A protein has these predicted regions:
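A short alpha/beta connector and helix-capping loop motif
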Residues: 39-57
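Histidine-centered divalent metal-coordination motifs
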Residues: 5, 94, 98
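Structural detector of well-ordered beta-strand residues that form the stable sheet scaffold
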Residues: 51-53, 92, 123, 145-146
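Aromatic- and acidic-residue-enriched segments that line the glycan-binding/catalytic groove
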Residues: 60-75
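C-terminal active-site subregion of NodB/CE4 polysaccharide deacetylases
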Residues: 1-30, 35-42, 86, 103-163
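Surface-exposed, active-site-proximal loop segments in enzymatic domains
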Residues: 65-66, 101-103
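Acidic (Asp/Glu)-rich catalytic clusters
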Residues: 43-48, 73-92, 138
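Short, catalytically relevant binding-site loops at active-site mouths
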Residues: 36, 57-60, 97-99, 129
Length: 163
């Protein structure tokens, strides 16, 4: 599975992919945070296997927490659900606040990983996880979890690659 964040003609940094790069990519795609520019370029999702990883506290807001990145807006719930319905995207969870879960207590981890609606797939913020985090993800009912830093291919240690 490939990981993407933003779709833009202007490639500000590695968190941005051009529409042409997305069109030419092979395999399943995943979008972290579901930026509004994904919604604006939604035609690129047609016929693709796409997972949208949502961060609850940031839905409809900006990425102001993401120091060093250009300020961008995330989709709101209506836009996210429209993408799910029109393009048959899978809805995944990326925590409420996007904090490093490995630094939190067990109770805090559980609060972060339990989504507002049932979802089957989770993406670890910053790709970081440990046994406490994996256990919380299992308790929350997820069937799979993805990282961008490491993984052994098992259900809760699947690896995504940057496009």
């Amino acid at each position: 599975m490939l990981i993407l964040h933003n779709i833009s003609r202007d490639k500000h940094n590695s968190n941005y992919n051009t529409p042409q790069e997305v069109e030419q990519s092979d395999g399943p795609l995943s979008f972290d945070g579901v930026y509004y520019n994904v919604y604006l370029n939604q035609g690129l999702l047609e016929g693709r296997d796409v997972t949208l990883f949502v961060m609850g506290d940031h839905v409809g807001k900006t990425n102001k927490f993401d120091i060093g990145q250009p300020l961008e807006r995330y989709c709101d719930w209506n836009q996210i659900m429209e993408l799910v319905e029109i393009y048959n995207c899978r809805l995944g969870w990326h925590s409420w606040s996007h904090r490093d879960l490995t630094t939190l207590s067990e109770q805090e981890i559980l609060r972060e990983v339990i989504p507002p609606i049932p979802m089957d797939v989770f993406a670890y913020p910053y790709g970081k996880f440990n046994e406490k985090v994996i256990e919380a993800v299992k308790i929350a009912g997820f069937k799979e979890a993805y990282s961008v830093t490491e993984g052994d291919g098992s259900e809760y240690q699947r690896l995504r690659a940057y496009l």
